[in-house]
Structures are given as structure tokens and as C-alpha cells.
Regions:
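N-terminal strand-loop element at the rim of the active site
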Residues: 11-17, 25-65, 221
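Short His-centered aromatic/hydrophobic patch
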Residues: 88-94, 111
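A short, active-site helix/loop in glycosyltransferases that binds the activated sugar's phosphate group
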Residues: 118-120, 127-128, 132-158, 166-168
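Conserved donor-binding/catalytic core segment of Leloir-type glycosyltransferases
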Residues: 135-137, 174-192, 198-203, 214-216
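Short hydrophobic beta-strand element within catalytic cores of glycosyltransferases
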Residues: 263, 287-290
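A charged, aromatic-enriched C-terminal amphipathic alpha-helix characteristic of glycosyltransferases
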Residues: 314, 327-358
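Conserved acidic donor-binding segment of nucleotide-sugar-dependent glycosyltransferases
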Residues: 302-313, 320-327
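Nucleotide-activated donor-binding/catalytic signature segment of Leloir-type glycosyltransferases, i.e.
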Residues: 227-252
């Protein structure tokens, strides 16, 4: 596309190799040549050194909460970009501020999480007001349904699907050559079921000494993530269960670990809005076990084993079934690779480009 897009990151989203979350990774993966990234100051080199990055800091005006001052700083920053479309990620209040303070500016709000838990989109009335000013792209059908909940059917035309994408490796190590390892990769928090994973491993480790169990992740997506009470409580339990807690690792190392592990487990309690870890695990050729919540079922399809992780006895049973059955792991890995191919980077870029084009041509309702 020949016109420019200003891509706005949330105020706490990193965009450097050693400090980046899921949103930043997808922004980098789907970026167009004309994109300028606008967000908080970087903690290191940019993920996209060939793209312009405009760092913003909340000023003193307008008075009020920090998120309002960040939105005002964003509005000032995008004014000088010459962007035809301002693409705001996961912050309805920021998108609303930009649209209201820059009349005529085309805005696309990209939602990665449940909008009903976001400031400025909690109620149907707020979501309807957003559609008067902008178009909305959702990373999954589940997120889209949550946005449209309580709105008239006529609103659906302005709320589209723009799924996340994954770079599918040309080859994945055969299951028979992989480490006998069960891997958890993600934030080490209760919502992600980190404690359920440890509890399941504790049941399995004594009877399967030829397998090992590993967790990659921390409370936050950065090397200096805080050691929370949850993490402190989990560490001795993980040690007793024989689970290696590796802490935060850069994204490339996480993908490499997925390519080596036989099984990856995504035992989320909360309704995952998409489930990027599950998609990456399937693309890497691991056998996947995931929770049947939120957007995970539509991402996983038949490419993984859907299993409620709570209580952990059920999760342990599902893990044991795959650990003890190489042909089952091989079959699941093959189906996972096929499912992941449906979410390739080029498809994701095409979906995002179509949403940007619609926002430019249509504007608000």
C-alpha cells in the first residue's frame, strides 16, 4: 500500500529483542514498508531497525491519569507522521482520544484482548461510540464476538477479523528425534495455569524418569521481570516436582525450545483471546495440549489436544497419554503443523492490509 500507517503501541509494550510482548512481536511481524511505529521509549535496539520509531513520553497536559496523558502525547506524535491511518493496538481510550482530537483522521483499533475489560469499551454504549469514530479489527472470532456483544447487527460490518500470524518453519525436527521434554512457555501467572502445569508434572515425574519438564517465562516479558509472590511460591514446588524454571528468555530462544520439545502445554485458566503460544507450538512441530477456552479452540482446531487443566489430575492424564504414545505425538504434531499453516504470516498481513484499506475508505459510521 502506498500510504503511510502510524502503528501505536500500548504505553507499557516493549519493542526491543529483550523486552517485548505478544503485541510488539505481531506489530513487527506484520509491519508494512510504510509503517512508522509510535510507542514508549525503547529499552534497546528496535525490533525493526529499518522502520522509523517515534518514542513518546506522557507530558504534563492534560491533567489526569497517565493513560490520558499518554493518549495526548500519541495524538501529538502522529500529527507529524503524515499517516493516512492511525492503527492503535489494544487501547480503546487512546484510539478514541486520537479520533476526537484529530478530526478526519482515519483510525483502526486492533484488539488483542477482551474489549469488555478495557477502559473505554466496557459497555455496549462505549463500543457503539467507538464505531462512530473508527473501524475495529479483532485477532479472533472470540474477541470479535465480545466486542459485538449487545450491539445491533448493523455494527458487524465495521468489526473485522485480523488474526495473528506465524512464520512456519520449512522443516520441523521429527518427533522421534526430539527431547523427551514437556514445555510450558508463557507468563508465570495464575491466569496462564503455571501452577497447574507444575502440579501435573509433580504427578508424572516419579514414574517417567526419562522425561524432563521445563518452564520458560516470568511475570513479565522482560529480563528484569519482578519476582512476584506467585513466582516465589511456585519455585519450591517446581523444584520438588523436577521442573526447571528457566525464567524469561528472548522470543527466538522460546521458539527454539519449542522445536526441541516433544510436548508443549498451554494450560490457561483465563479465556485466551487468541493463543499465540499454542500457534507457535504447532508451527514448531510439537504435540500441543491446550485449554478449551476463549479463542484457543478456533486457533488450535484439530491440531492439538484440548483439555481443561483444572483440576491438574485431568491435565496430568492428558500429558501422560501423549508421553506414553509416540505415534499419537507424531499424529498430533502433523495435524498441528497443518493447522498452523492456516495462520501464516502472509495471510495475516493480507487481513491487516484489508482492514487498513477499509478504515481508510470508510472511516467511522
Amino acid at each position: 500500500m502506498p500510504w503511510r500507517v502510524a502503528v501505536v503501541l500500548p504505553a507499557r509494550e516493549g519493542f526491543s529483542p529483550r523486552a517485548v510482548g505478544a503485541i510488539g512481536l505481531q506489530v513487527a511481524a506484520l509491519a508494512g514498508r510504510q509503517d512508522v511505529i509510535v510507542g514508549p521509549p525503547l529499552d534497546g535496539p528496535s525490533l525493526l531497525p529499518d522502520h522509523e520509531y517515534r518514542a513518546v513520553q506522557p507530558g504534563l497536559w492534560p491533567p489526569g491519569r497517565r493513560s490520558l496523558r499518554y493518549a495526548a502525547a500519541i495524538a501529538r506524535a502522529v500529527a507529524g507522521t503524515g499517516a493516512a491511518v492511525v492503527e492503535v493496538h489494544n487501547r480503546p481510550d487512546t484510539a478514541d482520544y486520537v479520533a476526537r482530537h484529530r478530526p478526519g483522521q482515519r483510525v483502526l483499533l486492533v484488539l488483542h484482548n477482551d474489549p469488555q475489560g478495557m477502559r473505554g469499551a466496557e459497555t455496549p454504549g462505549q463500543r457503539r461510540d467507538l464505531l462512530r469514530l473508527m473501524d475495529v479489527a479483532c485477532v479472533s472470532g472470540w474477541v470479535r464476538q465480545r466486542f459485538l456483544d449487545g450491539l445491533p447487527d448493523s455494527c458487524a460490518r465495521q468489526v473485522g477479523l485480523s488474526p495473528n500470524g506465524v512464520a512456519l518453519p520449512a522443516m520441523a525436527p521429527p518427533m522421534a528425534q526430539r527431547a523427551r521434554r514437556v514445555l510450558f512457555a508463557g507468563r508465570v501467572v495464575a491466569d496462564k495455569g503455571a501452577d497447574l502445569f507444575v502440579a501435573a508434572c509433580a504427578r508424572l515425574a516419579p514414574t517417567r524418569p526419562d522425561w524432563d519438564f521445563r518452564m520458560i517465562g516470568a511475570d513479565r516479558f522482560r529480563t528484569d521481570a519482578p519476582v512476584t509472590p506467585f513466582v516465589s511460591d511456585l519455585r519450591p514446588k517446581a523444584t520438588a516436582a523436577g521442573v526447571d524454571m528457566a525464567g524469561y528468555r528472548p522470543h527466538a530462544e522460546v521458539l527454539a525450545a519449542m522445536a526441541q520439545a516433544a510436548i508443549v502445554v498451554v494450560p490457561s485458566r483465563w479465556p485466551e483471546p487468541f493463543g499465540m503460544t499454542a500457534l507457535e507450538a504447532m508451527a514448531a512441530g510439537a504435540a500441543l495440549i491446550a485449554s478449551p477456552v476463549g479463542g484457543l479452540p478456533e486457533v488450535v482446531g484439530n491440531g492439538g489436544l484440548l483439555c481443561a487443566p483444572d483440576p491438574a489430575t485431568g491435565l496430568a492424564h492428558a500429558m501422560a497419554g501423549l508421553m506414553d504414545d509416540l505415534p499419537a505425538r507424531e499424529d498430533l504434531a502433523a495435524r498441528g503443523r497443518a493447522q498452523a499453516a492456516r495462520f501464516g504470516i502472509e495471510h495475516a498481513r493480507a487481513c491487516r492490509a484489508a482492514m487498513r484499506d477499509a478504515a481508510l475508505r470508510r472511516g467511522g459510521a
